[in-house]
Amino acid sequence: MIRVAINGYGRIGRSVLRALYESGKRGQMQLVAINELAKPEAIVHLTNYDTTHGRFHTRASLDEGMMHLGNDAIRLLAIEDAAALPWQALDVDLVFECTGALNDRQSAEAHITAGARKVLISHPSSADVDATIVYGVNDASLKATDTVVSNASCTTNCLVPVIDVLDRHFGVKSGAITTIHSAMNDQQVIDAYHDDLRRTRAASQSIIPVDTKLARGIERILPQMKDKFEAISVRVPTINVTAIDLSVTLDTRVDIATVNAALKAAADGSASGILGYTDEPLVSCDFNHDPRSSVVDGTQTRVSAGHLVKMLLWCDNEWGFANRMLDTALAMAATQAE
């Protein structure tokens, strides 16, 4: 049983808590504290009620600075300086760093200073972290000495399992990616100021291009893909679920059936629970609360001239990613136990 804490109780932090209670992993992981600079009443309310994922099946209540979930008591903290958090006193093995702010090694190590043994960052990180992990692809590379780890991004987790399968079966020469991403909380409800002029505009009224370093994130997990991919990203007026338009040029000549068969076999076999495959006529909301990292939409696979393949991938950018946070945390703990 590992003792964990969540720092930053926003969309991903709350999804991590819910995923822990829905995934059957509570026998392996105990949540002892949440640090969030918000009123405890608001923390409890947003645990119980969620516009995207519905009401929580376990009723949360507040009593003397503790959030109670069934028989569990979780300490609520509101401490701005991560280095001052009481992780040593609480005997915290691992911190889920979900603020979106402490994304490089130096800032994330504040949790180690505070007494935690390991940190898992819910965001792409600087190159000097001990590891960047896409669970199901490179988690076997984790070592006991890895203390500050990044869980990459939701879109990297969606793409990399698919690219890995395609490369192993057919060889990938190059690729281009467009992420069609749901709106996020760094956008505006109505027009307001932002450093990114496109993000000054109302999220519910426009398709909004944003910068992305997704291609570089792929290279970090699959070094053989260096300089082979480029990516753009647009935000769309939905609150959850992301689609990814993936185009790749393959070494091997293929057809639609061959590509889909390879991906379906992986989804049914070695990548089960991480990669999914569907040939049903589904839309984005059908993938809400889907715990997998990526689902291939086989109905949208296209092949041009035998080598250029276009595909559509789906992911719940909150729920799938939160479930991988749990998987990666347990994988980190397992290296310590070896």
Swiss-Prot record:
* Protein's name in the database: D-erythrose-4-phosphate dehydrogenase
What is a GO molecular function of this protein? erythrose-4-phosphate dehydrogenase activity
Q: Where does NAD(+) bind?
A: 11-12, 317
Identify the residues that bind substrate.
153-155, 199, 212-213, 235
Keywords of this protein's UniProt record, alphabetized?
Cytoplasm, NAD, Oxidoreductase, Pyridoxine biosynthesis
User: What SMART domains does the record point to?
Assistant: Gp_dh_N
Source organism of the structure: Shewanella amazonensis (strain ATCC BAA-1098 / SB2B)
Signal peptide residues are: none
Question: What function does the entry list?
Answer: Catalyzes the NAD-dependent conversion of D-erythrose 4-phosphate to 4-phosphoerythronate.
